[in-house]
């Protein structure tokens, strides 16, 4: 049997209210796709039964995997372990893909694969779909990447603060994910940051299509990117940030200037996000955690990497000046209004 072009992994946890819409959009890819529905120990609704229903109805496309609760990261790990597709994409069960854009992307991947030029990373736009006031905001990369051709990091332009690669914008070759040895931590939110960071040094070729493929549903009260939820789960944000500090030696990338610069920028952003949510907590314990995180960065990276982050973007949120915390939070609120990120 011919290899599937792409594996979609859909981690599902008590997702019965919205997962069908997600799955139906993925089914539009037809037989060239494999859809792995990972039921992450759901107990409160019909998620397990819905997974089994689709697996029975589409046996050549859909696999249902039931696991003990391990969190979103273990759902992604489970998908990688079981994937048979050439490419791998994670789609959260409350999100969906634009079907017309998906057909266009898969047609291009088929063409490139037939030529023997399949890229390690396919990149597309993603769209924030806000539940409260229904505006949408598209994140595109037309100023960062060449369009509709193969390229590498030497061809990459400048990323604006709102243009980081996220899980929503990427399709990795499955083998890249296996080669980099990435295993996401269990019972931890925000591991999507590891997913788009750790494999990057293993990516040798990329392709960007200016298509609004991924629709990112944002604004549910229980969502992990909800601000109050992030404050409560800040320890998980810190765990992910430490993992990212440890998983790559950025000094080993000095021969790849643009890749190293981007990864420094991304790690700086993770430090800044951690600082902001510790500031929002405002407790003495949170301040101690902030100091410990910066000490961890200093102890586990070179002096050059530490200085780049401490005195660059990451350090902006750790100002050692009077009323520095208020300035940081004011800047965060302004950015929140501009970029509508949670």
Task: Specify the residue positions occupied by each region the protein language model found.
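Catalytic core of nucleotide-sugar-dependent glycosyltransferases
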Residues: 211-220, 226-254, 269-303
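Membrane-interface aromatic/basic loop that binds lipid-linked glycans or pyrophosphate carriers
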Residues: 279-342
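Short aromatic/hydrophobic "clamp" motif used to bind/position activated sugar donors
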Residues: 88
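Glycine-rich, basic loop-to-helix element that forms the pyrophosphate-binding segment
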Residues: 67-83
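A conserved acidic beta->alpha catalytic loop
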Residues: 39-49
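Short, acidic, metal-binding catalytic loop of nucleotide-sugar glycosyltransferases
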Residues: 24-33
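Donor-binding/catalytic cores of nucleotide-activated saccharide
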Residues: 72, 95-206, 214, 218-230
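N-proximal low-complexity "stem/linker" segments adjacent to membrane-targeting elements
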Residues: 1-25
């Amino acid at each position: 049997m011919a290899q599937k072009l792409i594996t979609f992994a859909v981690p599902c946890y008590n997702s019965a209210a919205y997962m069908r819409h997600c799955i139906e959009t993925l089914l539009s890819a037809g037989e060239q796709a494999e859809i792995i529905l990972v039921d992450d120990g759901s107990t409160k609704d019909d998620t397990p039964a819905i997974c089994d229903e689709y697996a029975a109805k589409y046996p050549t496309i859909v696999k249902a995997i039931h696991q003990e609760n391990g969190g979103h990261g273990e759902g992604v790990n489970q998908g990688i372990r079981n994937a048979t597709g050439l490419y791998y994409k994670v789609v959260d069960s409350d999100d969906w893909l634009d079907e017309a854009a998906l057909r266009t992307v898969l047609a291009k991947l088929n063409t490139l694969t037939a030529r023997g030029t399949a890229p390690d990373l396919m990149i597309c736009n993603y769209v924030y779909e806000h539940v409260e006031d229904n505006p949408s905001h598209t994140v595109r990369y037309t100023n960062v990447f060449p369009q509709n051709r193969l390229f590498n990091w030497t061809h990459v332009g400048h990323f604006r603060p709102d243009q980081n690669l996220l899980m929503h914008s990427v399709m990795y070759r499955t083998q890249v994910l296996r080669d980099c040895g990435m295993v996401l931590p269990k019972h931890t939110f925000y591991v999507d940051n590891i997913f788009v960071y750790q494999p990057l040094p293993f990516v040798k070729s990329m392709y960007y299509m200016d298509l609004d493929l991924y629709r990112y549903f944002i604004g549910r009260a229980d969502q992990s990117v909800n601000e109050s939820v992030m404050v409560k789960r800040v320890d998980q944000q810190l765990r992910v940030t430490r993992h990212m500090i440890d998983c790559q030696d950025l000094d080993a990338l000095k021969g790849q200037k643009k890749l190293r610069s981007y990864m420094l920028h991304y790690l700086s952003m993770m430090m800044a996000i951690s600082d902001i949510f510790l500031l929002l907590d405002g407790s003495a314990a949170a301040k101690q955690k902030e100091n410990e995180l910066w000490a961890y960065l200093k102890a586990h990276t070179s002096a050059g990497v530490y200085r780049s982050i401490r005195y660059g973007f990451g350090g902006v949120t750790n100002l050692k000046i009077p009323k520095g915390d208020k300035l940081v939070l004011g800047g965060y609120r302004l950015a929140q209004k501009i970029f509508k990120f949670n």
